[in-house]
């Protein structure tokens, strides 16, 4: 493998494809329960909604689109939505970001979760006022009694410490004919920071003493490392070390 003026020679040997499948290892334990409603969103006393999704926005505007989905199903203003994306400690495991699945798969899951939340909050208001659920409606995050419009309460006042409920996979979704947010041309929330250079691109992010690792992979599935000659790489300016763990190989600089 060429790198600057140095050279690293790596030879691979190939075995059956099944061998590669057997080395996948165990997945780490999940930190949050995907079926818990509180995993997906929180609402504060000011009616601001924080949404947690396991996807990230790679520049395609999915943060804006997912915010629209959440605002629509919750019947809250778009600007009341705050999005936490891809934080592995606090967001649900929604697999990878890619293959056009963020909206198709991740958006569908978020839609069901927020529809569940909306139904749960309406139910709480109905119990509080001792009225039928069908008598209530939501406008901008405020539950209103249609028979007595002066009787109203915000989501933030209803939420308490949390939902403590499971996501209802059969939650009633809002009809497309009632959409007020989804389908609207809303300015993307990620653009301002990008055009003003405030956005911290990962390529420009550097901490004091931070190192870079280049992983060296075979072009063939199932290959194993037969030998490594890193004498040339060691001569490259900035070289720190070669790391080999079984068939994993990387150069740190």
Question: What is the meaning of each model-derived region?
Answer:
Residues 2-14, 19-253:
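Cofactor-binding beta-sheet edge motifs in enzyme active sites
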């Amino acid at each position: 493998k060429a790198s600057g003026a140095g050279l690293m020679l790596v030879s691979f040997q190939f075995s059956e494809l099944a061998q590669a499948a057997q080395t996948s290892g165990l997945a780490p334990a999940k930190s949050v329960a995907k079926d818990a409603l509180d995993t997906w969103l929180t609402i504060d006393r000011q009616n601001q909604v924080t949404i947690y999704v396991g996807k990230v926005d790679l520049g395609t505007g999915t943060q804006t689109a997912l915010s629209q989905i959440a605002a629509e199903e919750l019947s809250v203003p778009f600007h009341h939505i705050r999005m936490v994306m891809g934080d592995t400690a606090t967001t649900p495991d929604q697999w990878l970001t890619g293959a056009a699945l963020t909206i198709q798969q991740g958006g569908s899951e978020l839609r069901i979760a927020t529809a569940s939340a909306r139904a749960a909050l309406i139910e709480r208001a109905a119990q509080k006022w001792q009225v039928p659920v069908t008598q209530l409606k939501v406008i901008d995050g405020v539950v209103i009694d249609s028979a007595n419009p002066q009787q109203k309460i915000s989501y933030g006042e209803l939420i308490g410490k949390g939902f403590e409920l499971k996501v209802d996979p059969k939650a009633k979704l809002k009809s497309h004919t009632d959409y007020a947010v989804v389908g609207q041309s809303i300015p993307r929330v990620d653009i301002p920071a990008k055009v003003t250079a405030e956005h911290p691109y990962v390529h420009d992010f550097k901490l004091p003493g931070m190192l870079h690792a280049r992983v060296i992979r075979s072009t063939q599935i199932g290959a194993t490392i037969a030998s490594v000659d890193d004498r040339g790489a060691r001569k490259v300016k900035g070289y720190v070390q070669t790391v080999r763990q079984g068939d994993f190989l990387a150069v740190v600089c």
